Regions:
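Pocket-lining segment of extracytoplasmic ligand-binding domains
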Residues: 72-172
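Secondary-structure end/capping motifs
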Residues: 139-216
Length: 233
């Protein structure tokens, strides 16, 4: 498999803490001793980030899944915000929608936002939303892969021209509460809507994967990215 293009730039996860804990933006040290909700695998980005901040993710905090969030059809954002409000967790690691629900509801505040530089600089390139496919698909159906890249780029451009389109699409996939928020979530992130995959990202992602024990070695940019489609970015 190879990465074909980016859906957006940077690690798209936020650390949201209970509002009554009064943790300041960027104060990672204040997270010590807290119970933090995070989905399996997704938690790896948080663990690596905490290590960069000098916090032991196994000894200094308790990171575990939020009960009820792994059930199909359940909204992570709504469930996580409710768990935060009920005091079942002290903080959670979520994408933009999950964070927005908690902040808008008044139960949470953002502490870490790697995409905007609130966190270790290296964490920006730990992960990134991408379109990936198999080498077989690339070899046998390159026109289909190219069409998918063009479609992604067109959507990114369309969102920048008219962010209200996000609400129209959101109605088909999100509960009413999230649908009402999606346009403002997308609008805030429009500067990151770029299909390019950079060598800096691949270098950072490789280092992250090695640190997390997910791989060994240091594959090159060409080993990781299907560069024949880069002219479409």
């Amino acid at each position: 498999a190879k990465l074909v293009c980016a859906l957006s730039q940077g690690m798209y996860w936020f650390l949201v803490a209970r509002k009554d804990l009064n943790i300041a933006l960027g104060d990672a040290r204040a997270l010590k001793g807290l119970n933090i909700g995070a989905a399996p695998w997704v938690d790896l980005g948080l663990r690596a980030l905490l290590k960069e901040e000098g916090i032991d993710p196994d000894a200094d905090v308790n990171i575990a899944p939020i009960p009820g969030t792994v059930v199909p059809g359940v909204s992570f954002g709504v469930t996580a915000a409710a768990a935060l409000e009920d005091g079942k967790i002290d903080a959670f690691w979520a994408n933009g929608m999950g964070a927005e629900v908690a902040v808008t509801k008044g139960v949470g505040t953002i502490v870490l936002d790697p995409r905007r530089g609130v966190g270790p600089a290296a964490s920006f390139n730990f992960t990134q939303p991408v379109f990936a496919t198999t080498q077989k698909m690339i070899d046998e159906q390159p026109d289909t892969v190219a069409a998918a890249v063009r479609a992604i780029v067109n959507v990114q451009k369309a969102m920048k021209e008219d962010v209200s389109l996000a609400t129209e699409v959101g109605r088909k996939s999100f509960p009413e509460a999230e649908t009402a928020l999606i346009a403002q979530v997308v609008e805030r992130d429009l500067p990151f809507y770029d299909a390019a995959i950079t060598p800096e990202f691949v270098t950072g992602m490789n280092a992250f994967c090695r640190d997390m024990g997910l791989m060994t070695g240091d594959p090159s940019f060409e080993d990781v990215v299907a560069t024949q489609f880069s002219n479409l970015w």
